[in-house]
Amino acid sequence: EFLENAKKLSMYGVDLHHAKDLEGVDITLGVCSSGLLVYKDKLRINRFPWPKVLKISYKRSSFFIKIRPGEQEQYESTIGFKLPSYRAAK
């Protein structure tokens, strides 16, 4: 019964990583089975489902995701995050 309740929680199965957005604001990246989640002050501010993610890459301590364009957009967009270290970005 405990596990049944636990898996209903919004943070169940989310692997959290401290990061900063490209403006230097502290955020937390969450990786889970449904996609990549972005939290600020423990509040989810963005969600990127895996089918929308075209490419994941890293360079030094930066981590980038390329997002498939939506219905109204023509081009993919790349979103970057700064992580504490090269190993964290990798």
Swiss-Prot record:
Domain of life, per lineage: Eukaryota
Annotated GO MF terms: actin binding; calmodulin binding
Domain (FERM) ranges: 1-90
Modification after translation, per record: Phosphorylated at multiple sites by different protein kinases and each phosphorylation event selectively modulates the protein's functions.
Broad class of where this protein is predominantly found: nucleus
Name of the gene encoding the protein in the UniProt record: EPB41
InterPro entries for this protein: FERM_domain (IPR000299), FERM_PH-like_C (IPR018980), PH-like_dom_sf (IPR011993)
Entries under PANTHER family matching the protein: 4.1 G PROTEIN, PROTEIN 4.1
UniProt keywords, alphabetically: Actin-binding, Calmodulin-binding, Cell cycle, Cell division, Cytoplasm, Cytoskeleton, Mitosis, Nucleus, Phosphoprotein, Transport
Organism whose genome encodes this protein: Gallus gallus
An individual GO BP term: positive regulation of protein localization to cell cortex
Lineage: Eukaryota, Metazoa, Chordata, Craniata, Vertebrata
One matching Pfam family: FERM_C
Protein name as catalogued: Protein 4.1
GO cellular component: cell cortex; cytoskeleton; nucleus
UniProt subcellular location: Nucleus; Cytoplasm, Cytoskeleton; Cytoplasm, Cell cortex
Function: Protein 4.1 is a major structural element of the erythrocyte membrane skeleton. It plays a key role in regulating membrane physical properties of mechanical stability and deformability by stabilizing spectrin-actin interaction. Recruits DLG1 to membranes. May be required for dynein-dynactin complex and NUMA1 recruitment at the mitotic cell cortex during anaphase.
Coiled coil segments of this chain: none
Oligomer status and interactors: Binds with a high affinity to glycophorin and with lower affinity to band III protein. Associates with the nuclear mitotic apparatus. Binds calmodulin and DLG1.
SUPFAM superfamilies on file: PH domain-like (SSF50729)
